[in-house]
């Protein structure tokens, strides 16, 4: 049997797994905690020689020898994935294996990479134990040093170390050869939802450590039952049985020694078990870290010093909740892969730190390391910045679900070692990180005897943490009840959130929810409201953090991102990897801004907004709200009338308090048609590790009880109306427009010789599909044909009422082959001033029983002159917003451009909607343009693209701007949902086949003659 097809071989000559740490010759250097100051450390990253083969058997004779001719080998960068460096084939799938399922066997044609390089070993390594460490190799490999075979390892995202002391020539050049196999028996356990990428993708390190030093250690920093004193235990395991002295010194954040003790190692082990009085606690909100220094001495000579961050916290079950430091915390988390758009799974510490900082800035407090141990940098950073971790085993065998025997290997005892060793190696590497709250057994691999064994071993190895596994549906072994994408409402689903609330006897975690694919996710607030309302619901992890697009360029140099199927990979789940809260270049999506708002640390409620009395409710689990300042602004449209600054008073976690904002509404002279709001911003009072003082973490907005009806304007002047064949010409003093008397359309509007509108409003029920329409798009297109719209004119009438023209158009609006339809009535009231009052009213008719249960939109679409790209509007902004994704938006007066309104999703789709709009102006550089306004409110969007353009385009580079602007005014836009994997649009947010009336006014104008907001405040009086 081939080594790489033997699931009962965990490794050959690999060292036992241990914690990842650095060792230093002195405390002074240990304080710097940088590998440059260790005893001996060499990073073997860089350019290696490389040979790509179709199978291991094609390896040339003697390829591992030191004298092998490498001149004909290619260069390759380590760390790196060979597919992104021109070898093999990129392939993305969510669950399919890329070969026949016949465990443990893999294809004979097994892409293989031979890596070679030389390296000089300095004198600093002499008399040291020399270890070579591979932090990540996909999927399995053999290792040779100086032509001698060292061993074999697998499990792509686990570290592996080999003792090569006896093979290294100190003071000379040495060489290393690694033969990597794309497929191994381990691949059956590495079927995660991600790109299949191979090679040496994490750091390779050459480490020299003292032979009498510490090989491994375990730190337990717990709390007593009163959560007051620290339970501090350390076990250090040495490489020697000599009775050396080991000093354990614990230093606080102020560099004060709080504990020190020296013990004599016995039989290769040194231990302490102490109580530290009145310790500071570690939490994600208050990540207080002590520093432990372990110093090994022999006869007064320092052998080594090892630094280790220590955080005291306690984790325990308490009936239907789990507690951290006695509190039933709420996870406000994300699932995170290691990912780079340029380098795939090769990520730097700097990239990871940017992620953590961004998460903290957006109120995220937890990460699930989906679905494998992430780069070790992540864990240090989560300890330091404050981020709870569910640390997940590199284990998923999702593809077996399609065989009808999901438990095929999960319930096969012969695979026990393969399952358990993956978890034990993870626990050993990461056991000393306070950020880790749960060990997770893996993902989407059914349940069976091997998971039972994993649970038992995890509890035995680490009784201080809890065990998570979503696949344990009956919560037979896991400590918490974990689910994915549990729906809030759906009569066809057997188990909803309400069932968890009513029936579950264990804490609940939503390990994946609110699938963030494309424009979305929706329903975030609905889920979070449930979490806040029920103790047993302890939050969840949005799927997921990144869009996993691969950075690419067109021939002209335009950047875009490729996804599944773009490399000829088949089968592929296509754009299912484009499902993150941030885009591939780490730009926050509108969904991330929405999530930030939904999980913000302060909930603000108006008690008496006229008097400025509001209530502040802390959503923190531990921190006090006195870390914030409050800035308020009383707004009149875009004008700040009053502003103030105050320190948020002391409010303990989860407590609330009324405060009064000292504004005075009595002095405000209310203007006709103006809108008044108070905007509240909660900002960090002091600099933190993740943001500067002044960074905003929470907001609130309340409409003020100030309003005066807009100025009534009676139309004056004369209209010239003339019928010419099928066209009705209308002229005023400085404008003209035409109606088509065949289809009833408003054909154009001209102001001072400039055509501001080239196609008038026409009812549309369609919008470009969003990624979250994935499960219903075929039904929308192939059953209801909603993208194939038809308007049949039943009657057109026009007449004068004094100096005002009324045009009435009755239509039937529906789609191809549909027996349901709207009876629609357009009423245009054209005034001599140039104002056009438009009412569009629809009534469901025909076979209403055959109509869809929701519509993409109900609104009208127009074409405007391409020069009118400057946008001002009073409505919800600044980002796009939809019925189930609008918490981050505030009412206000915003200025933008058509380009600026466009959200550049990796896969073009519906975007840029704004709800609650009172008016919108579209103008050119000279101020000439068109105003749309209403006494109620409407949705609007403006784009360079028709819905068909967005629907047809597969990438952003496929989009070609139209020579006009598409301007939409909608009665209702459908919600977003998360139905790419989860809850569809909730009933209360849907656009339905229902009676509707959309009323608005179009006014051609010059913004330099009259300001848009003043024009919008006018009310047209038609009374005689």
Task: Specify the residue positions occupied by each region the protein language model found.
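N-terminal pre-domain segments of enzymes
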Residues: 1-42, 49
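Beta-strand-rich binding/interaction modules
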Residues: 145, 229-264, 270-272, 292, ...
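Accessory beta-strand-rich segments of carbohydrate-active enzymes
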Residues: 3, 8-11, 34-35, 49-53, ...
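Substrate-binding/catalytic cleft of secreted carbohydrate-active enzymes
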Residues: 356-359, 366-581, 590
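Substrate-binding clefts and catalytic carboxylate motifs of secreted carbohydrate-active enzymes
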Residues: 36-60, 77-78, 83-85, 196-199, ...
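Active-site-adjacent substrate/metal-binding segments within catalytic domains
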Residues: 80-134, 138-145, 151-154, 210-220, ...
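Beta-strand/loop-rich accessory regions of lumenal/periplasmic or secreted enzymes
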Residues: 84-85, 136, 182, 283, ...
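An acidic-aromatic loop/edge-strand motif
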Residues: 81-84, 89, 96-105, 154, ...
């Amino acid at each position: 049997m081939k080594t790489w097809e033997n699931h009962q071989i965990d490794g050959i000559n690999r060292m036992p797994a241990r914690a990842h740490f650095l060792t230093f010759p002195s405390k002074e250097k240990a304080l710097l905690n940088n590998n440059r100051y260790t005893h001996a450390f060499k990073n073997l990253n860089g350019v290696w020689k490389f040979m790509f083969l179709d199978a291991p058997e094609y390896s040339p004779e003697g390829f591992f020898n030191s004298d092998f001719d490498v001149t004909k080998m290619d260069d390759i960068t380590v760390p790196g994935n060979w597919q992104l460096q021109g070898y093999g084939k990129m392939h993305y799938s969510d669950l399919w294996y890329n070969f026949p399922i016949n465990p443990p066997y893999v294809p004979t044609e097994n892409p293989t990479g031979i890596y070679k390089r030389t390296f000089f070993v300095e004198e600093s390594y002499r008399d040291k134990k020399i270890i070579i460490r591979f932090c990540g190799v996909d999927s399995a490999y053999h290792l040779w040093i100086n032509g001698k075979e060292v061993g074999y390892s697998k499990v792509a995202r686990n570290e592996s170390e080999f003792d090569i002391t006896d093979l290294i020539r100190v003071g000379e050049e040495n060489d290393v050869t690694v033969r990597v196999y794309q497929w191994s028996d381990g691949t059956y356990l590495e079927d995660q939802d991600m790109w299949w990428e191979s090679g040496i993708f994490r750091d390779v390190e050459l480490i020299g450590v003292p032979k009498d030093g510490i090989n491994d250690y375990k730190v337990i920093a717990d709390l007593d039952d009163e959560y007051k004193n620290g339970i501090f235990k350390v076990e250090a395991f040495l490489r020697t049985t000599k009775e050396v002295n080991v000093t354990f010194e614990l230093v606080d954040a102020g560099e004060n020694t709080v504990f020190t003790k020296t013990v004599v190692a016995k039989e290769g082990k040194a231990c302490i078990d102490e109580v530290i009085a009145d310790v500071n606690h570690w939490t994600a909100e208050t990540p207080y870290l002590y520093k432990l220094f372990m110093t090994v001495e022999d006869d007064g000579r320092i052998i080594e010093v090892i630094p280790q961050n220590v955080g005291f916290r306690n984790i325990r079950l308490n009936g239907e909740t789990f507690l951290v430091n006695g509190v039933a915390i709420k996870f406000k988390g994300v699932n995170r892969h290691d990912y780079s758009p340029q380098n795939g799974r090769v990520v730097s510490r700097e990239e990871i730190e940017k992620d953590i900082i961004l998460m903290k800035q957006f109120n995220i407090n937890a990460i699930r390391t989906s679905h494998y141990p992430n780069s070790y940098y992540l864990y240090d950073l989560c300890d330091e910045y404050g981020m709870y971790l569910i640390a997940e085993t590199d284990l998923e065998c999702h593809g077996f679900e399609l065989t009808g025997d999901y438990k095929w290997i999960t319930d096969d005892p012969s695979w026990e070692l393969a399952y358990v060793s993956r978890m034990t190696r993870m626990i050993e590497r990461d056991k000393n990180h306070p950020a880790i709250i749960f060990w997770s057994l893996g993902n989407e691999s059914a349940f069976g005897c091997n998971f039972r064994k994993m649970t038992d071993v995890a509890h035995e190895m680490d009784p201080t943490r809890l065990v998570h596994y979503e696949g344990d549906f009956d919560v037979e072994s896991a400590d918490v009840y974990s689910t994915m994408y549990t729906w809030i409402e759906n009569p066809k689903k057997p188990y909803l959130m309400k069932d968890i609330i009513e029936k579950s006897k264990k804490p609940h975690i939503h390990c994946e929810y609110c699938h963030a694919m494309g424009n979305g996710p929706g329903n975030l607030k609905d889920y979070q409201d449930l979490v806040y309302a029920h103790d047993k619901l302890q939050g969840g992890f949005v799927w997921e953090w990144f869009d996993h697009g691969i950075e690419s360029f067109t021939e002209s140099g335009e950047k875009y991102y490729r996804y599944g199927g773009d490399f000829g990979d088949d089968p592929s789940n296509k754009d299912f990897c484009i499902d993150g809260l941030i885009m591939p270049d780490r730009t926050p999506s509108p969904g991330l801004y929405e999530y930030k708002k939904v999980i913000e640390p302060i909930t603000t409620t108006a008690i008496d907004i006229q008097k400025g009395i509001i209530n502040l409710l802390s959503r923190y689990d531990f921190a006090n709200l006195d870390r914030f300042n409050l800035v308020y602004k009383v707004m009149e449209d875009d004008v700040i009338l009053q502003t103030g600054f105050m320190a948020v008073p002391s409010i303990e976690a989860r407590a609330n308090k009324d405060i009064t904002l000292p504004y005075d509404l009595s002095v405000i002279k209310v203007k006709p048609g103006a809108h008044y709001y108070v905007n509240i911003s909660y900002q960090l009072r002091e600099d933190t590790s993740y943001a500067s003082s002044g960074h905003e973490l929470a907001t609130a907005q309340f409409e003020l009880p100030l309003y005066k009806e807009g100025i009534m304007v009676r139309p004056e002047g004369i209209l010239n109306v003339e019928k010419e064949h099928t066209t009705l010409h209308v002229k005023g003093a400085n404008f003209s427009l035409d109606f088509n008397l065949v289809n009833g359309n408003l054909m154009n509007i001209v102001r001072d010789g400039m055509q501001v509108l080239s196609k008038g409003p026409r009812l549309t029920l369609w919008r470009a599909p969003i990624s979250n329409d994935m499960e219903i798009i075929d039904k929308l297109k192939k059953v209801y044909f909603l993208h194939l719209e038809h308007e049949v004119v039943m009657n057109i009438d026009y007449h004068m009422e004094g100096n005002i023209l009324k045009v009435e158009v009755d239509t039937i609006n529906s789609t191809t082959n549909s027996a349901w339809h709207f009876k629609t009535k357009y009423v245009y009231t054209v005034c001599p001033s140039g104002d056009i009052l438009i009412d569009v009213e629809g009534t469901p008719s025909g076979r209403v029983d055959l109509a869809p249960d929701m519509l993409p939109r109900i609104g009208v679409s127009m074409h405007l002159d391409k020069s009118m790209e400057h946008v001002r509007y009073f409505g919800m902004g600044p980002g796009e917003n939809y019925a189930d994704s609008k918490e981050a938006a505030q009412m206000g007066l915003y200025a933008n451009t058509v380009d600026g309104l466009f959200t550049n999703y990796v896969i073009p789709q519906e975007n840029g909607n704004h709800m609650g709009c009172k008016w919108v102006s579209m103008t050119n550089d000279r101020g000439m343009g068109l105003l749309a306004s209403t006494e109620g409110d409407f949705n609007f969007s403006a784009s360079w693209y028709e819905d068909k353009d967005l629907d047809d385009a597969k990438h952003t580079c496929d989009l070609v701007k139209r020579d006009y602007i598409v301007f939409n005014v909608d009665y209702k836009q459908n919600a977003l949902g998360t139905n790419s994997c989860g809850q569809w649009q909730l009933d209360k947010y849907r656009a339905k086949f229902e009676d509707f009336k959309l009323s608005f006014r179009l006014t051609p104008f010059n913004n330099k003659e009259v300001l848009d907001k003043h024009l919008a405040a006018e009310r047209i009086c038609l009374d005689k």
